[in-house]
């Protein structure tokens, strides 16, 4: 099969390693999703991700790479990008033909999808962990270990047949190994250097609480809103003292137009038991200073403020009235 050549072309972007990059526990992975509806219709999607941040996508209509950030090119020249896009177009054409030809032998029944995930994780400048996994219709199908194709138990006999074929393709295995253990780590470091200002950006979240009546009588749906934070990873939990409330439900992390994120976390509680609950937020921008908001705390502050301000206003009014009365009494 030729589909592994996609992985080679997608990461051979050129460029050198920047020596002053130091980044740990971050991964770069490439995704390919190829959908085969029948013998005459195929769609290929491609993307690249730096941890949870998408850096590239593939426009199958125009046959071009979409760079999603100003730094997504790394240190690659326009000529290198042009050459890579041409190679990708050729690859997808050959990939489609090759898979269709092998479909009968591998017992692939239309329609079907093939997903490929290749990447590397950087632990230090000297240590990386690489991987290449292939799925068929969303189930583990095969993987590459060192320079060999290894079938997944879920892939059954079809995966074994595919590996039997791939293991005879010495050039394909060499390409896969080279991409995982050489090109991927170098590309990862290049992106980290080119995008370090954006990747190292830290924006503190804003947090507020709200509630709404529940469909069940006597219950409240408490909501903890966390907005405007960056980067994306965050931990939010409703708490009672030091105890996490396991019924906490987290919604999807949604993007803002400025690149920051929003999250809503809810808890369904009996109204009388809402007192004493708090929402705790942990984020890299906060360092070790978690944000903790207590339910009902805002109301308590208002009551305290009213308890202080109202008597003060009454005292001022009383003083003014006394002065006014004294003034009238002094008039003959």
UniProtKB/Swiss-Prot annotation:
<dbReference type="GO" id="GO:0002250">
    <property type="term" value="P:adaptive immune response"/>
</dbReference>
<dbReference type="InterPro" id="IPR013783">
    <property type="entry name" value="Ig-like_fold"/>
</dbReference>
<dbReference type="InterPro" id="IPR011162">
    <property type="entry name" value="MHC_I/II-like_Ag-recog"/>
</dbReference>
<dbReference type="InterPro" id="IPR050208">
    <property type="entry name" value="MHC_class-I_related"/>
</dbReference>
<keyword id="KW-0393">Immunoglobulin domain</keyword>
<feature type="glycosylation site" description="N-linked (GlcNAc...) asparagine">
    <location>
        <position position="38"/>
    </location>
</feature>
<dbReference type="InterPro" id="IPR037055">
    <property type="entry name" value="MHC_I-like_Ag-recog_sf"/>
</dbReference>
<dbReference type="GO" id="GO:0048006">
    <property type="term" value="P:antigen processing and presentation, endogenous lipid antigen via MHC class Ib"/>
</dbReference>
<comment type="subunit">
    <text>Heterodimer with B2M (beta-2-microglobulin).</text>
</comment>
<dbReference type="GO" id="GO:0005615">
    <property type="term" value="C:extracellular space"/>
</dbReference>
<dbReference type="InterPro" id="IPR003597">
    <property type="entry name" value="Ig_C1-set"/>
</dbReference>
<dbReference type="GO" id="GO:0071723">
    <property type="term" value="F:lipopeptide binding"/>
</dbReference>
<keyword id="KW-0472">Membrane</keyword>
<dbReference type="InterPro" id="IPR036179">
    <property type="entry name" value="Ig-like_dom_sf"/>
</dbReference>
<comment type="function">
    <text>Antigen-presenting protein that binds self and non-self lipid and glycolipid antigens and presents them to T-cell receptors on natural killer T-cells.</text>
</comment>
<keyword id="KW-0391">Immunity</keyword>
<keyword id="KW-1003">Cell membrane</keyword>
<keyword id="KW-1064">Adaptive immunity</keyword>
<dbReference type="GO" id="GO:0048007">
    <property type="term" value="P:antigen processing and presentation, exogenous lipid antigen via MHC class Ib"/>
</dbReference>
<dbReference type="GO" id="GO:0030884">
    <property type="term" value="F:exogenous lipid antigen binding"/>
</dbReference>
<feature type="topological domain" description="Cytoplasmic">
    <location>
        <begin position="322"/>
        <end position="332"/>
    </location>
</feature>
<dbReference type="InterPro" id="IPR011161">
    <property type="entry name" value="MHC_I-like_Ag-recog"/>
</dbReference>
<keyword id="KW-1015">Disulfide bond</keyword>
<protein>
    <recommendedName>
        <fullName>T-cell surface glycoprotein CD1c2</fullName>
    </recommendedName>
</protein>
<feature type="disulfide bond">
    <location>
        <begin position="120"/>
        <end position="184"/>
    </location>
</feature>
<feature type="transmembrane region" description="Helical">
    <location>
        <begin position="301"/>
        <end position="321"/>
    </location>
</feature>
<dbReference type="GO" id="GO:0001916">
    <property type="term" value="P:positive regulation of T cell mediated cytotoxicity"/>
</dbReference>
<keyword id="KW-0967">Endosome</keyword>
<dbReference type="Pfam" id="PF16497">
    <property type="entry name" value="MHC_I_3"/>
</dbReference>
<keyword id="KW-0325">Glycoprotein</keyword>
<dbReference type="GO" id="GO:0010008">
    <property type="term" value="C:endosome membrane"/>
</dbReference>
<feature type="signal peptide">
    <location>
        <begin position="1"/>
        <end position="17"/>
    </location>
</feature>
<feature type="disulfide bond">
    <location>
        <begin position="224"/>
        <end position="279"/>
    </location>
</feature>
<dbReference type="InterPro" id="IPR007110">
    <property type="entry name" value="Ig-like_dom"/>
</dbReference>
<keyword id="KW-0812">Transmembrane</keyword>
<feature type="glycosylation site" description="N-linked (GlcNAc...) asparagine">
    <location>
        <position position="75"/>
    </location>
</feature>
<keyword id="KW-0732">Signal</keyword>
<feature type="glycosylation site" description="N-linked (GlcNAc...) asparagine">
    <location>
        <position position="25"/>
    </location>
</feature>
<feature type="domain" description="Ig-like">
    <location>
        <begin position="205"/>
        <end position="292"/>
    </location>
</feature>
<keyword id="KW-1133">Transmembrane helix</keyword>
<dbReference type="GO" id="GO:0030883">
    <property type="term" value="F:endogenous lipid antigen binding"/>
</dbReference>
<dbReference type="Pfam" id="PF07654">
    <property type="entry name" value="C1-set"/>
</dbReference>
């Amino acid at each position: 099969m030729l589909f592994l050549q996609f992985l080679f072309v997608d990461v051979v972007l050129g460029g050198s390693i920047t020596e002053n990059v130091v980044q740990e526990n971050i991964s770069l992975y490439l995704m390919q999703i190829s959908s085969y509806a029948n013998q005459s219709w195929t769609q290929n999607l491609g993307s690249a991700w730096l941890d949870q941040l998408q850096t590239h996508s593939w426009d199958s209509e125009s046959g071009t790479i979409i760079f999603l950030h100003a730094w997504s090119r790394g240190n690659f020249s326009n000529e290198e990008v042009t050459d890579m896009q041409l190679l990708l177009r050729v690859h997808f054409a050959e990939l489609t033909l090759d898979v269709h030809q092998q479909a009968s032998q591998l017992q692939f029944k239309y329609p079907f999808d093939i997903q490929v995930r290749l990447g590397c994780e950087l632990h230090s400048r000297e240590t990386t962990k690489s991987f290449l996994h292939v799925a068929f219709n969303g189930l583990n199908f095969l993987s590459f270990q060192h320079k060999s194709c290894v079938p997944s138990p879920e892939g059954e006999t079809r995966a074994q047949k595919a590996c039997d074929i791939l293991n005879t393709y010495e050039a394909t295995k060499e390409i896969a190994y080279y991409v995982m253990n050489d090109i991927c780590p170098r590309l990862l470091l290049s992106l980290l250097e080119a995008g370090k200002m954006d990747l190292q950006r830290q924006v503190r979240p804003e947090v507020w609480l709200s509630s709404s009546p529940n469909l069940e009588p006597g219950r409240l749906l408490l909501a903890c809103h966390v907005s405007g934070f960056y980067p994306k990873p965050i931990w939010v939990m409703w708490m009672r003292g030091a105890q996490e409330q396991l019924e906490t439900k987290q919604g999807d992390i949604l993007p803002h137009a400025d690149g920051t994120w929003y999250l809503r976390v809810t808890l369904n509680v009996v109204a009388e038991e809402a007192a004493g609950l708090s929402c705790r937020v942990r984020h890299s921008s906060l360092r070790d200073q978690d944000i903790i908001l207590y339910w009902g705390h805002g109301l308590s502050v208002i009551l305290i403020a009213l308890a202080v301000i109202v008597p003060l206003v009454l005292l001022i009014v009383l003083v003014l009235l006394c002065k006014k009365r004294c003034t009238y009494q002094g008039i003959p």
